[in-house]
Amino acid sequence: MSRAGSGSSPGARGAALALWALWALWALPAAVSGCSCAPAHPQQLLCDAALVIRAKISSEKVVPASDDPLDSHKMIRYEIKQIKMFKGFEKLKDVQYVYTPFDSSLCGVKLEANNKKQYLLTGQILSDGKVLIHLCNYIEPWDDLSLSQKKSLNQRYQMGCGCKITTCYSVPCSITAPNECLWTDWLLERRLQGHQARHYACIRRSDGTCSWYRGGPPPEKEFMDISEP
C-alpha cells in the first residue's frame, strides 16, 4: 500500500489512494495464487466497464504508480491511438494513455506496442482521469472478436445491462428471476469463449424479462435444456 509523504499534495495523495484502493482488491488473492478473475460473459464485462474503446498501442513505458516519492510501485503506461469509443463519452472524449499494474500478479496486462495490432480495451476511469486496465477487464485483439461481438459493441450489449447473466457450472441450472439469462458455455464446452460468448447477447424485452439474442451465424449445435437434471 502506498504511503503519502508529508510533502505530497492533496491531489497526489488522492490519486494514489484511488489507485491503490483498486489494487488492494486484486492483491488479496494475488498474494497467494496470482491474478484471479471470476468468469464473466463479455456483455457483463462491458456493462461493468466505465470505458470501452478500440485502439492501437503505440508505445509503452514503465512509470511510477503515483507522484508520491515514497511509493515504489510501478505501472506500465501504454500510449494508444484511439480508433473508436463505444462507452465513456460523458467522462472522456479522447484517450491518449492507459495504465496497468506492472506486475502480472496484480493483473497487469501485456499488450503488443507495435502500432499495428488493434485491441478492444475496457477499463475504469480513476478520480484523476487516468484509465486503468487489468486482466479482469474484457481485453481482446480486435481480430479475435466475432462479427456478432463487434456489432454488439454499438448498442446491443448496453441494451442488456439491466439483465443478469448467470454462469452454469453443473445441472440442474435454472433461472431464479425473469431478468436472468443462463450462460452455459463452460457447462457444455468447458470453455468460456464458447457460442454464447461469441454470438449471443442477453437483451431485456418490453415486458421486463431477459433472453438471449443471437446476433451472428447460428452455432453448430443447439443449447441443451439444462433446467432439469
What is the predicted function of each stretch?
Residues 2-229:
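Transition segments tied to proteolytic processing and entry into folded domains
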